[in-house]
Regions:
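Short amphipathic alpha-helical face segments that pack within enzyme cores
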Residues: 112, 138-139, 143, 325, ...
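Acidic/polar loop patches that form or flank catalytic/metal-binding clefts of enzymes
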Residues: 126-127, 181, 207-208, 237-238, ...
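Short glycine-centered, acidic/aromatic-flanked micro-motifs in structured strand/loop junctions
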Residues: 130, 185, 209-212, 379-381, ...
Length: 478
């Protein structure tokens, strides 16, 4: 049984401190600007600070510890060579205000990365400004708005979103000023074509779609969906959250999508969240290129230049040019993978279906909707809840006692007591087998043990609702 490292580690401001008098006198500092008291920050030795954060790191869990199967998050292992190259001084020491002639290498890298992403997705142009996936969605919705306004159709204020869409889609559309209309899935877990047909109108601006969707099911009617959307005068938006499943196998542009956002911090092996920052580049078809944020990188002979002369651009959505170091990591990853990129899709889909089948055959976890899945799948703990009073939340918490990170839970909302699992292509058969064995073992355990979990972690079961409602944002509040 796995046991987490556990330290009784206080906050930095609670560690033993030296009281040091600070001489703030200097003749050039006016009296009214001089400190009367030392700053209210911890006064610690370097060794204390290093040990503090090292201990905290040992109580954390990351992809280096083990499998991290958060559904729709693609928590694959990130090759460390990408981190190494992105940390070169040639990249870290440049400044966005430098002249173009002094950053030709970086501009060339971004130009080539754009060409790679265009080839992978079937788009005609990309912007790297968005700092994350949801930021990319927001840009995509602004592009939709600009497109319809440019074409004299500003009354298109509705964005259609399936109930299996990625979770941030409704918020992004709403922030861009659209009304969100949700349509249901059919009994196979894909878009209900009749519901879509009834919802499309001259008010429809776009349909936002993830393909495969968050159930891990490929939308096999995508070409019919594309025709219906475009016949209605609307645009088709692709959320790239699940692109990992179709890399080198299918392209959103060939399916008829007009706008795509990608997650470099997911599909192209750059760190997520606290290991970030992220990057959510947005690609478009040719007739939308003129609306992309400025500047755009173009090649002028042998030189690369930043082009601000885009009168129809929506402007900027972020300072400078985006999270360039994240782009560097993705660029290195793509160079490493080369033509083997399609194996990412093949192995991720294979791992997902292997794991899904083992869980389904266990008899403890139910698989709603059709059987064949892509890179991820969703099982339900509803049977465990009926028979033993064990919820998906309980299973997730108990997995922590096995030294394993839980999957996404309670999403998508159309599956009751959902466990959303994405093993990714970087996990071995042995890793997957061990995770399945843990899930089966939990299903067989005493319900009270599962409901009281975790018992072996440094922090026990927390009140997530209270934490969200009453955040403590600074150590001064503790």
């Amino acid at each position: 049984m796995y046991r987490f490292a556990r330290f009784d580690e206080p906050l930095l401001n609670k560690l033993p401190q030296k009281k040091v008098e600070i001489d703030v006198y200097h003749s050039s500092i006016p009296d009214k600007l001089r400190r009367k008291h030392p700053p209210n920050i911890p006064n610690l030795e370097e060794q204390q600070v290093v040990r503090h954060f090292f201990r905290l790191s040992q109580m954390n869990y990351g992809i280096e510890n083990g499998m991290y199967p958060l559904g729709s998050c693609t928590m694959k292992y990130n090759p460390k060579i990408c981190e190494d190259i992105a940390s070169w001084r040639e990249f870290t020491d440049i400044h966005p205000y430098q002249g173009e002639s002094t950053v030709q290498g970086t501009l060339e890298m971004l130009y080539e990365l754009e060409a790679m992403l265009k080839e992978i997705t079937g788009m005609d142009a990309f912007s790297f400004q968005p700092a994350a996936g949801a930021h990319g969605e927001f840009l995509g919705m602004l592009l939709v708005r600009a497109y319809h306004e440019f074409n004299g159709d500003p009354d298109r204020k509705e964005v259609i979103i399936p109930d299996t869409a990625h979770g941030t889609n409704p918020a992004s559309a709403k922030m861009a000023g659209f009304d969100v209309i949700e349509i249901p899935s059919n009994n196979e877990g894909t878009v209900d074509l009749e519901a879509l047909r009834k919802t499309l109108s001259d008010k429809t601006a776009a349909l936002m779609l993830t393909n495969p969707n968050t159930l891990g099911i490929f939308e096999t009617d995508i070409l019919e969906i594309e025709k219906m959307v475009h016949d209605a005068g609307a645009l088709l938006y692709y959320d790239g959250a699940n692109l990992n499943a179709i890399l080198g196998k299918a392209r959103p542009g060939d399916m008829g999508f007009d706008i795509v956002h990608l997650n470099l911090h997911k599909t192209f092996a750059t760190p997520h969240g606290g290991g970030g920052p992220g990057a959510g580049p947005v690609g478009v078809k040719e007739d939308l290129e003129k609306f992309l944020p400025v500047p755009r990188i173009k090649k002028d002979g042998k030189r690369y230049v930043l082009d601000y002369d885009k009168p129809y651009s929506i402007g900027k959505i972020r300072d400078f040019y985006g999270n360039i170091e994240v782009c560097i990591k993705a660029y290195v990853y793509l160079l490493m993978m080369g033509k083997s990129l399609k194996e990412v899709a093949e192995i991720s889909v294979l791992n997902s279906n292997y794991m899904k089948e083992k869980l389904k055959r266990s008899g403890f976890y139910e698989l709603p909707y059709k059987d064949l899945r892509k890179h991820e799948f969703v099982v339900s703990c509803e049977k465990l809840l009926r028979e033993k009073g064990i919820r998906a939340l309980d299973v997730a918490k108990r997995l922590l006692d096995y030294g394993m990170h839980p999957p996404t839970i309670y999403f998508p909302l159309i599956v009751k007591e959902a466990l959303m699992i994405e093993p990714t292509e970087t996990e071995t058969k042995e890793d997957i087998d061990a995770y399945v064995d843990a899930l089966i073992s939990i299903a067989k355990e005493d319900p009270e043990v599962v409901r009281s979990a975790p018992s072996k972690t440094p922090v026990k079961r927390v009140d997530e609702a209270s934490a969200a409602k009453n955040p403590v944002l600074t150590w001064k509040d503790i």
